[in-house]
Amino acid sequence: MMMNRQQIDSLVQQMNVATATGEVNLRVQQIVVRLLGDLFQAIEDLNMSQTELWKGLEYLTDAGQANELGLLAAGLGLEHYLDLRADEADAKAGITGGTPRTIEGPLYVAGAPESVGFARMDDGSESAHVDALIIEGNVTDTAGQIIPNAKVEIWHANSLGNYSFFDKSQSAFNLRRSIFTDTQGQYIAQTTMPVGYGCPPEGTTQALLNLLGRHGNRPSHVHYFVSAPGYRKLTTQFNIEGDKYLWDDFAFATRDGLIATALDVTDLAKIKQYNLNKAFKHIKFNFQLVQDADQVPLQRLIVVE
């Protein structure tokens, strides 16, 4: 049976609108009807078989059970598309400036320990074999005025490319902190050098990427939420210069303005200044926040009680 779009839309309406007997969430109904119509049209256009359809549903079930749907959304470019869409909305509204946004990814956890000005992020478990890293910078508005008491939430992977909470071998909130900027708008984080990571090689995301002929690797990076009263919350990250996947990020997160250089510091006075006892890496990364707008996208949160 071949259907045209008018017939498809009529069928979807019959099955999912006309059958309603209870209170309807009109927005959910609108989205479901549109997505089903588009899916039915794709089935017609591509002559998808029932086997292919059920295989797809089985895949989504497996991805959900593996907690990889968020990873899949990043890997297929959905998150990056939303960023581009938000950029276009800003441009149309005449909103300019500010640190570029980029994807959140699926590995944020709310509730990290808070401090003012400075925080040590790592638990010391990798100190003997991984370079220490100092990340510091300032938070200002687009005119360069400092923003004290801005909340800088930071999280990144360890030297194996794993994140605490998702990697049960790490201590709680390892490499996760919330730092409120000091009176000069500054934050300083002492941590360890992260590395990039790949999708689980036997996981559902990599399985689909294999069928598309794509790799599933990310460059070394550090995630941020930056927020302050009166300003739009910024979701972003920087990728570290020199990584082979810097401009070949499977999640499409690398953007101009979001590339950081990790400098080697061997000067003894500098080492002492940061209360360290050996050479370390140093990254300077500043943020500019845009004044608040009427609508700010909500963030997904994993809340740990």
Curated annotation (Swiss-Prot):
Listed GO biological process terms: beta-ketoadipate pathway; catechol-containing compound catabolic process
Gene Ontology MF terms: catechol 1,2-dioxygenase activity; ferric iron binding
Q: What pathway is this protein a component of?
A: Aromatic compound metabolism; beta-ketoadipate pathway; 5-oxo-4,5-dihydro-2-furylacetate from catechol: step 1/3
From which domain of life does this come?
Bacteria
Q: How does the cofactor attach, per the note? A: Binds 1 Fe(3+) ion per subunit.
Which reaction is this enzyme known to catalyze? catechol + O2 = cis,cis-muconate + 2 H(+)
Q: What is its EC number?
A: 1.13.11.1
Q: Does the keyword Heme apply?
A: no
Q: Which Gene3D superfamilies does the record match to this protein?
A: Aromatic compound dioxygenase
* Alphabetically ordered keywords of this record: Aromatic hydrocarbons catabolism, Dioxygenase, Iron, Metal-binding, Oxidoreductase
Q: What induces or represses this gene?
A: By phenol and benzoate.
Residues binding Fe cation, per UniProt = 163, 197, 221, 223
Which cofactors, by name?
Answer: Fe(3+)
Which NCBIfam families has this protein been placed in? catechol_proteo (TIGR02439)
The UniProt subunit note reads as follows: Homodimer.
As for family, the record states:
Belongs to the intradiol ring-cleavage dioxygenase family.
The identity of this protein, by name, is Catechol 1,2-dioxygenase
Q: Which organism is it from?
A: Acinetobacter guillouiae (Acinetobacter genomosp. 11)
